From Swiss-Prot:
Enzyme type, top EC level: hydrolase
Gene behind this protein: FAL1
Stated family: Belongs to the DEAD box helicase family. DDX48/FAL1 subfamily.
Disulfide bond entries: none
Protein name: ATP-dependent RNA helicase FAL1
Comment text on domains: The Q motif is unique to and characteristic of the DEAD box family of RNA helicases and controls ATP binding and hydrolysis.
Catalytically driven reaction(s): ATP + H2O = ADP + phosphate + H(+)
Motif extent (DEAD box): 175-178
Residues binding ATP: 70-77
GO biological process, one term: maturation of SSU-rRNA from tricistronic rRNA transcript (SSU-rRNA, 5.8S rRNA, LSU-rRNA)
Originating species: Candida albicans (strain SC5314 / ATCC MYA-2876)
Record's GO cellular component terms: catalytic step 2 spliceosome; FAL1-SGD1 complex; nucleolus; preribosome, small subunit precursor; small-subunit processome
Length: 399
């Protein structure tokens, strides 16, 4: 794991009201963490805490309910993972921490981060996700898992089957909370919460926290500490954003092909709004002899895992996906995101383009728009206090 771009991370400003009185820890040593955890942090590649880590880790360790917001790629996963690992009793094999995520890929990724950070602590962790045989979960849970990372549907299933014992869970983490609190997951999260001990600590984490999400968190949290980014700081300053005006929807494909002839990139992600469009675009690109892979929520989990692993290893260069990939998935080499379709909601814009500038690295986002999209693009600019420029004629100037 590469280190952060310190200059970029230092630009992040937190709301004074929300962080008043919170001590900022400039080093991991000053947090007095377990020696084996500290060893795991350094082995993972961290040297000094990022802005969110320096503020939120100790709040989580203190046992307070915590609401933490920061940009994509600034180490949010490690923030709650470190806080959680510090309070785990390694002598007990009971489940003590539960992490809920909106996508299977994100749940697996979090499990991997926890595994690496807890490498020297002999931590047992399992990803509990749909799309796989529940028998595998039952077997793993019977062996004893101190930390479970999962998607709400499968987690509530194993709780109801009594395979996942909840009596010793100390901390519940809701990652990408804005997505989790949408209709599909809300009821499942309430259901899970009802099975947890009344004393459970709740940690809410997301890159964006709209007012309605903050209102919903009040049902789960008691006097939470809020570590929130200033509204005008919720932008990705390390990412250059452009748009290409296409007269009609069917001109987008030719524009995309033209872009590919000119761009020299390591890896790229192209986002479409529907599974149908993903399949169509992947087929069209392959007909033009472009090497691409496609991923969406209707695929079997094994197929999704295989595509993700290939993409992570760099075996495939271009991934076409729906928003299933936009949430928190960390592939270091991605330097370009193309929105073939603009996202249907403002919150997903930052999640999508954040894939191109992980951990402070520079990235580029290109939006293909028709005249019908102009108003939406202007709304995104206003919402994120950012400027999306028209792409210059010479594409190499922007890469």
């Amino acid at each position: 794991m590469d280190d952060f771009d310190r200059d970029l991370d230092n630009e992040l400003e937190f709301s004074h009201k929300s962080t008043k009185g919170i001590k900022v820890h400039r080093t991991f040593e000053s947090m007095n963490l377990k020696p084996d955890l500290l060893k795991g942090i350094y082995a993972y590649g961290f040297e000094t805490p990022s802005a969110i880590q320096s503020r939120a880790i100790m709040q989580i360790i203190s046992g307070r309910d915590t609401i933490a917001q920061a940009q994509s790629g600034t180490g949010k996963t490690a923030t709650f993972s470190i806080g959680m690992l510090e309070v785990i009793d390694t002598k007990s094999k009971e489940c003590q921490a539960l992490i809920l995520s909106p996508t299977r890929e994100l749940a697996i990724q979090i499990q991997n981060v926890v595994k690496h950070l807890g490498d020297y602590m002999n931590i047992h962790t399992h990803a509990c996700i749909g799309g796989k045989n529940v028998g595998e979960d039952v077997k793993k849970l019977q062996q004893g898992q101190q930390i479970v990372s999962g998607t709400p549907g499968r987690v509530i299933d194993v709780i109801k089957r009594r395979n996942l014992q909840t009596r010793n869970i100390k901390v519940l983490i809701l990652d990408e909370a804005d997505e989790l609190f949408t209709k599909g997951f809300k009821e499942q999260i309430y259901e899970i919460y009802k099975h947890l001990p009344p004393s459970v600590q709740v940690v809410v984490v997301s890159a964006t926290l709209p007012r309605e999400v903050l209102e919903m968190t009040s049902k789960f949290t008691t006097d939470p500490v809020k570590i929130l980014v200033k509204r005008d700081e919720i932008s990705l300053s390390g990412i250059k954003q452009y748009y290409v005006q296409c007269e009609r929807e069917d001109w987008k494909f030719d524009t995309l092909c033209d872009l590919y002839d000119n761009l020299t990139i390591t890896q790229a992600v192209i986002f479409c709004n529907t599974k149908l469009k993903v399949n169509w675009l992947a087929d069209q690109m392959k007909k033009q002899n472009f090497t691409v892979v496609a991923m969406h929520g209707d695929m079997k989990q094994d197929e999704r895992d295989s595509i993700m692993n290939d993409f992570r290893r760099g075996n495939s260069r271009v991934l076409i996906s729906t928003d299933v990939w936009a949430r928190g998935i960390d592939v270091q080499q991605v330097s370009l995101v193309i929105n073939y379709d603009l996202p249907t909601d403002k919150e997903n814009y930052i999640h999508r383009i954040g894939r191109s500038g992980r951990f402070g690295r520079k990235g580029t986002a290109i939006n293909l728009i028709t005249k019908d999209d102009v108003v939406t693009l202007k709304e995104f600019e206003k919402y994120y206090s950012t400027k999306i420029k028209e792409m210059p004629m010479n594409i190499n100037d922007i890469m």
